UniProtKB/Swiss-Prot annotation:
GO terms for biological process: succinyl-CoA metabolic process; tricarboxylic acid cycle. Its EC number is 6.2.1.5. It catalyses: succinate + ATP + CoA = succinyl-CoA + ADP + phosphate; GTP + succinate + CoA = succinyl-CoA + GDP + phosphate. Gene3D superfamilies: ATP-grasp fold, A domain (3.30.1490.20), ATP-grasp fold, B domain (3.30.470.20), Succinyl-CoA synthetase domains (3.40.50.261). It is an enzyme of class 6 (ligase). Residues 9-244 form the ATP-grasp domain. Succinyl-CoA synthetase functions in the citric acid cycle (TCA), coupling the hydrolysis of succinyl-CoA to the synthesis of either ATP or GTP and thus represents the only step of substrate-level phosphorylation in the TCA. The beta subunit provides nucleotide specificity of the enzyme and binds the substrate succinate, while the binding sites for coenzyme A and phosphate are found in the alpha subunit. Mg(2+) binds at residues 199, 213. GO terms for cellular component: cytosol; succinate-CoA ligase complex. This is Succinate--CoA ligase [ADP-forming] subunit beta. GO terms for molecular function: ATP binding; magnesium ion binding; succinate-CoA ligase (ADP-forming) activity; succinate-CoA ligase (GDP-forming) activity. It comes from Yersinia enterocolitica serotype O:8 / biotype 1B (strain NCTC 13174 / 8081). ATP binds at residues 46, 53-55, 99, 102, 107. The keyword Nucleotide-binding applies.
């Protein structure tokens, strides 16, 4: 679950990390009043969406008058911002952040993620702030400096100083950076975050460090113990189908193809998408119904898949381990009857009671194609889309 920049900065302030004075506003009048609270300009106004690339898309602007602030708010509030990180429809803008402008001398990067290989929280710092860290990692990886947090001792000030020295910081900047590092690490651990970025972390012309931007991603599996973060969730920034799937504990990710995929197991789901592409098709989604593929969950999965107008056929790929394939077949038949599926449905069942399940599908009289193998299923669903 992602947070907006203004929400990230609110948390930064509570953990002792410096950020520009700013206010999130929902109306042009609020935006003008925010500028008055901040004081003399210039100011920076920013669209609040869960996507990068806002500046290049016109969603971030330096302004010198309250009239310009009002004009920016009127231009964007209630509209959608399209960036290179959004789809063609963009993300809705419901708030803009009005901040005091900062005199920037240099831009740095500071971020943290969970490194699955080392099973540690790893902090990354670089002198190449203000650009995508992925690009830096690809082109000049030697410019990214890392430290890993020991899960027993937690973050240590010496680790912050180590990164500060590698960034070329001196004097008071070392102490300031160490304070930011410790605050960010504590925030990461206490709030069950999955990712945090300050990009850029700037050095002002007065020689001070300021968190100019902030991006936080919370671990969705830990939200049950983070009530404050749950309240910060902005569902308008999420794909409606993905949000609906989450309510049923279905793992759904929308893609750009026209073959809907319903699979039990994340690995099998990825393999299913691969074999669809191998035979010339394009998956419309990733959907993992998990181990408990009940009739109710299968029905909801069909509803979610078919809510995408691009879907011309559905590929159901189920491996019956503990779950019996004949019961899965009953669920598929019931779901197709309830939802009223009007596109071809190709089903491949393998494992526990697979033959009985395939017979039930064949005897149902519905527009369900029972495949004999994974390859056969992929070929049939691609052919079905081509026939349409």
């Amino acid at each position: 679950m992602n947070l907006h920049e203004y929400q990230a900065k609110q948390l930064f302030a509570r953990y002792g990390m410096p950020a520009p004075t700013g206010y999130a506003c929902t109306t042009p009048r609020e935006a003008e009043e925010a500028a008055s609270k901040i004081g003399a300009g210039p100011w920076v106004v920013k669209c609040q969406v869960h996507a990068g690339g806002r500046g290049k898309a016109g969603g971030v602007k330096l302004v010198n008058s309250k009239e310009d602030i009002r004009a920016f708010a009127e231009q964007w509030l209630g509209k959608k911002l399209v960036t290179y990180q959004t789809d063609v429809h963009g993300q809705p803008v419901h708030q803009i952040l009005v901040e005091a402008a900062t005199d920037i001398d240099k831009e740095l990067y500071l971020g943290a993620v969970i490194d699955r290989s080392s099973r540690r929280v790893v902090f990354m710092a670089s002198t190449e702030g203000g650009v995508e860290i992925e690009k830096v990692a690809e082109e000049t990886p030697e410019l990214i400096h890392k430290v890993a947090l020991d899960p027993l001792t937690g973050p240590q000030p010496y680790q912050g100083r180590e990164l500060a020295f590698k960034l070329g910081l001196t004097g008071k900047q070392v102490a300031q950076f160490t304070k930011i590092f410790m605050g960010l690490a504590t925030l990461f651990l206490e709030r069950d975050l999955a990712m945090v970025e300050i990009n850029p972390l700037v050095i002002t012309k007065q020689g001070d460090l300021v968190c100019l931007d902030g991006k936080l991603g919370a671990d969705g599996n830990a939200l049950f113990r983070q009530p404050e973060l749950r309240e910060m969730r902005d569902k308008s920034q999420e794909d409606e189908r993905e949000a609906q799937a989450a309510q049923w504990e279905l793992n759904y990710v929308a893609l750009d193809g026209n073959i809907g995929c319903m699979v039990n197991g994340a690995g099998l789901a990825m393999g299913t998408m691969d074999i669809v592409k191998l035979h010339g098709g394009e998956p419309a989604n990733f959907l993992d119904v998990g181990g408990g593929a009940t009739k109710e969950r299968v029905t909801e999965a069909f509803k979610i898949i078919l809510s995408d107008d691009k879907v011309k056929a559905v590929f159901v790929n189920i491996f019956g381990g503990i779950v019996r394939c004949d019961l899965i077949a009953d669920g598929i038949i019931g779901a197709v009857e309830e939802v009223g599926v009007n596109v071809p449905v190709v089903v491949r069942l393998e494992g526990n009671n697979a033959e009985l399940g395939a017979k039930k599908l064949a005897d149902s009289g519905l527009n369900i194609i029972a495949a004999t193998s994974l390859t056969d299923a992929a070929q049939q669903v691609v052919a079905a889309v081509g026939a349409k």
